[in-house]
Amino acid sequence: MSIQITTELVKELRNATGISVMQCRKALEEAEGDMQKAVAILKKTSSDIALKKADRNAADGAVSVKNAGEKTVLVALHCETDFVSRNEDFLKLLSDLTDKALNEGIDKMKEDSKEMIDGVIQKTGEKVELGEVFEVTGPVVGNYVHQGKSAVIVSLEGGNTELAKDIAMHVAAMRPEYITSSDVNDEIKQTMNEIFAKEVANIDKPEDIKEKMLEGKMATYFKEKTLMDQPFIKNSDQTIAQLLDQNKAKITSVKRYSI
């Protein structure tokens, strides 16, 4: 005798899993009305769907940063389209993964992430995969997340959290490639010197003038690329180095991630 799959039973399974009504009904029919078996069937289906989508390109996504005490974690979650990156289930998954990484540790989060991700793959129909995950610890840490697509975490020695947040926002906006001029290696300097030397080579000026022009181009280029030399985005009359000196602070780390 066949088991009648009631609307209430389907609704109960849907509320428990978030999976579509059609898939819930199908799972309940296959499980002959057994709720636990139906949940297991849906999990197996989620895993199978994820496997089929494994070779797709998940180039979009979102990033989340959360902190508690002296610990800050960043988690990036990738999907195929911007549409899904704004999906409620996708964003809840990202939030849950970030909470788990913060409260239980990154390794534990990664262990538990597959089943959580597979469920969202089944709901959205897109490939979803875990991206960059890292942790920053320290007494003074600030972060800035821009439109859920990029994030910066800045750790300071001295200063305060608001200062760290301001510098994180600056880094997100200005995208410096180096923290200090000493971070620029000789190979990069040589490459840029050759590029700018070609630009001034045919200028009708004396050699000493061209040499000064070359030096000026080099100085301007690396000033724009170096965090400490950049004018602070909130006060262009002050460089980041001057801002830090004013607050008796030093940068100990800058981490940035963009989808």
Predicted regions and their residues:
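N-terminal assembly/interaction segments in proteins that build large macromolecular machines
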Residues: S2-I259
